[in-house]
Amino acid sequence: MRKFFDYFKGLSKSSRALSVPPTSDVDGPLDFEMIVEEIEHAAKKMKYGKACGYDNYCNEMILALVKTYPKVLLKLFNDILRSSEVIPGWALGMIVPIYKDGPKLDAANYRGITLISCLGKLFLSVLNNRLIAFSIENNLLSPSQLGFVSKNRCSDAHIIIHNLVKQKCHKEGSKIFSCFVDFKKAFDSVPRDLLLTKLSNMGITGKFFNILRHIYTTDKAGIKMGPSCSDFFNLDIGVRQGCILSPLLFNLFLCDLAKHFDAMEEKVKLGNIGINSLFWADDLVLFAETKEGLDKLLKILEDYCKENHLLINTKKTKCMIFNKTGRLMRRPFYLDGVKLEMVRRYKYLGFVITPSGEICTGLKDLRDRALKAFMKIKNDLGPSFNQDIPIILKLLDSLVKPIILYASDFWGCLKLPKNNPVENLHMLMCKQILGVQKQTTNAGVLLEIGRIPLSICAAKFSLKNWERIRLGVGNKILLEVFKEGDESWDQSIKSLLESNGMLNFYVDDPALEYPFVFKKLYQRLYDNFHETTFGAINEISSKLRTYALFKTEPGLEKYLTDVKNVSIRQHVTKFRLSNHRLAIETGRHDGTAPEARYCPFCPNEIEDEAHFLFKCSTLRHLRLRYLEPIKRGIRGFDFFPNSFKLKALMSDVEYDTCKFIADGTELRNFLISKPRPVG
């Protein structure tokens, strides 16, 4: 514990003398008494099962108190507000070291998670809501500050960059000079005295300010390992970890830099707006139309960081020149005297972008990350991986799907590459879950397992995002530029609607009931997929000509849930999807004419699925054992044409049918592989 104590204490110590502003003696605009509704509104965001702070009050206890005796909390909170000092335990945090990687005996290979008072969090949540309203009313934040702002999304930044690149580079043939800035431990290095001074200068005064001042000047933390906690040490630097106010306070600390950039002439013009910076918390990207413009922006940033005691990681700060061809262009850019690296790709807010703005590289990165997650599930489950398909599909949807569909509210409506990496991985996972070969027809796999293409899910997220933007919800810059240009993100939405026969919904109508309309849009996407897919398997040349006889409704097949024996189930799946070794299929690969694909045991008989089920003499004893009882339950079964028999037997596969297919397949394969006597 001593190693962790010394390490985290060292991180929390300021290297400079602090000059904390004095307490405020005037009544501030945020000092009005709390009401019950404020507490109840803040309590709605509290979740069960969260760890307690030093005072051991858990969320369950607090929520019960809010529900039964809210006025008790109201009196407590108002007393604290009037006194301008929080309860001492609320300024105490317990740091839990979480291992990252590297040698486990090195404390530097751990990150700290700070547990603070849950009751204190509720009080500060009320203050946070007040501060949000105050910052909006007084325009404290710049429109370029997207992060930690209500209803903004990471996709907002991606859409803005997409439209910039498409219009300026692809349409106009210009270049955009950009720099992706990496602040070094930005949240942990904010000087607290400068933060408080800036807040005071913004008009955040009175008791509200004094409470923030009291928390930040008495803040302490100890190291928690198991049930034990070390002595407490002072925290002199950075916004408080785990505090709900911290994201907004960090934004307010940087807002003077953002507004400085806003006032500059060096901007990339798009429509009626100019853009030279986008902030997402501590992720900053700078834009300019010329090299000299970006040099100026970098100089402003360098001076600001020196003045505000922030550090930039120049090794991780990269420059990129957006251009139509996507080639790597090199120009010298410097920050703090260090030459910055020019890159061809950069992972910005979790999605890889390139100089041309193409999305295939980003999709491949998502595919690779999702594949790792899928393989981990597969390796962890071992032999039981295929045991319960519904559970595996739930794991796929909860652990892998969110990774592969990350940022799809941005890219889901864009023109996807023909060899879509996301869809390729989805098909690979579905085929491994079913236990069929890679060559199995994709349409049949999706229908059998009851899945839809992930591209439809991605399109749905994009449409939902479009609904939000159309209703005027989102960042001010985004609302200005999302329609700009012939190849804008909005035009991609229009193309998506047109390709699905829904162009009539592309309207600006305030009276339009968007939730109802979008419900219809989503249903149309699903219907179009199923219509197209069922049409594909019904084609005469389709490999799934037999499958089309009995697969008439979408959804997970019942036998995939009911049959627990993996070997039997996989034999049935392969048989249904024509992923078997009957002559009707193997003849495709060795060039045998369809009319000459004979059964190896029955002279002059075409060996297809119907022959295997109803006629092959080699399987007669198995047929009597497994299929005869089923046939007797279907009146006139023997007089049906083969297409009717297949539909009757395979539409809802009974266990005995599964056993026949599995045992029959294994017997057939054994007899074929057995050496035959010569002569």
Feature names for model-found ranges:
Residues R130, V149, A281-D282, N313-K318, ...:
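Non-catalytic, peripheral interaction segments enriched in hydrophobic/basic residues
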Residues Y48-Y57, L105-L115, D156-S200, H611:
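Conserved catalytic palm subdomain of right-hand nucleotidyl-transferase polymerases, strongest
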Residues S384, I537-G679:
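Family-specific functional microsites
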Residues M1-N109, L122, E289, K347, ...:
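Surface-exposed loop/turn segments and immediately adjacent short secondary-structure elements
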Residues S12-H41, E85, A91-M94, A133-S189, ...:
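Active-site-proximal segment of RNA-dependent polymerases
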Residues F183-A281, L286-L297:
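Conserved polymerase palm-domain catalytic core
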Residues P29, P227, L311-R344:
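Short, conserved micro-motifs composed of acidic
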Residues L399, P421-H426, Q437-A583, G679:
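Extended C-terminal regions of large enzymes
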